[in-house]
Amino acid sequence: MAVRFIREDGDEILRKVSKKVDVIDERIKTLLDDMAETMYAANGVGLAAPQVGVLKRVVVIDVGDGLMELINPEIVEQEGEQIDIEGCLSIPGVAGEVKRPARVVVEALNREGEKITVEGKELLAVALCHEIDHLDGILFTDKVIRFIDEDEMERRRENKRRNKIRQNKG
C-alpha cells in the first residue's frame, strides 16, 4: 500500500469522466488499498480514483462506520434534500454549502466483484453523491450554494462541540 498524490483543482483529470471497471484484478485491488491509505492520511471521509490520477469508476468512503470500497457505483434511488457544508481533498481550504439528497441508494461492486447495495442518509448520502460526482468530472464547487469562510467554519465546529457536550450531559 502507498499514499498517492492527490490531484488538485486545475488538474484536467478532475474534469474528465471516468471509465467503468470491466475486470477487478490486482491493479484495481491495489488502487483500492492505496486510495484508502491516501484518504486516511489526508483525514478525508472519501476519495475517488480521479483524485489520485486514475480515470476508473472507483471510490472509497469512511464516514466513521468503517471503510466502504465501491466499484462502478451508481445512484439508483434518491429522496428528500439536505444542505450541508462540504469540502474536498482536491480543493484544500475551500468549503461551501451544497444541496444533496437526504437519502440515496447506491448499487456497486465490492473488491470481490459481488454486487452490493448501500443506503446512505445524512453524511453518508453526501459522501456518496460527492464521490460519484468526481467520477463524472463534477466538483462540489460546481454545485455550491454559498461558500463558507474559515471564521464561519470555526464557529460551526465550536457549536457542534458544544451541542455534543450538552447531549452527553443530558
From Swiss-Prot:
Catalytic reaction list: N-terminal N-formyl-L-methionyl-[peptide] + H2O = N-terminal L-methionyl-[peptide] + formate
Positions contributing to Fe cation binding: C88, H130, H134
Cofactor note: Binds 1 Fe(2+) ion.
Catalytic site: E131
EC class name: hydrolase
InterPro entries reported for this sequence: Peptide_deformylase (IPR023635), Peptide_deformylase_sf (IPR036821)
Keyword Transport part of the UniProt annotation: no
A molecular function GO annotation: peptide deformylase activity
Keyword annotations from UniProtKB, A to Z: Hydrolase, Iron, Metal-binding, Protein biosynthesis
Keyword Transcription regulation attributed: no
Assigned protein family: Belongs to the polypeptide deformylase family.
Name recorded for this polypeptide: Peptide deformylase
Gene encoding the protein: def
